[in-house]
Amino acid sequence: MRCKVFVNGCFDLLHLGHIELLNKAKECGDYLIVGINSNSSIKNLKGPSRPIFNSQYRKKMLLALDPVDEVIIFSEANALNLIKKIKPDIYVKGSDYKNEKTPETDFLLKLKKKIIYVDFYKNYSSTNIIAKIIKKNDKA
């Protein structure tokens, strides 16, 4: 039986931090499922100017990456319902979530599922990249 690993996020403006997270997540099991927030979900989380890339574009980008086996788009604010549906063996999150209680981690801990927190590149963030681009354009 294969070991299903699940990771989720916006993955808007794919960057090195995302790649590192996905590579480390794939090392944890046999089959990596990536849940991505829908366009409307990102708008609610990040603001009206987001996402930069629509969900189908982001899905295709992620599927082109070697560690990714499957991508599922979800429209809720969190991935809890998707986790209940796919029943992963391992859930991987960035270490920035280590001290946060989330509906996903609460649910998985009750089921005694493994949660792995991965260190990430602190200087890589889609939001920070967008801010840098705006700042550079303002100076031009």
Residue spans of the language-model regions?
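Nucleotidyltransferase catalytic core that binds NTPs
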Residues: 1-140
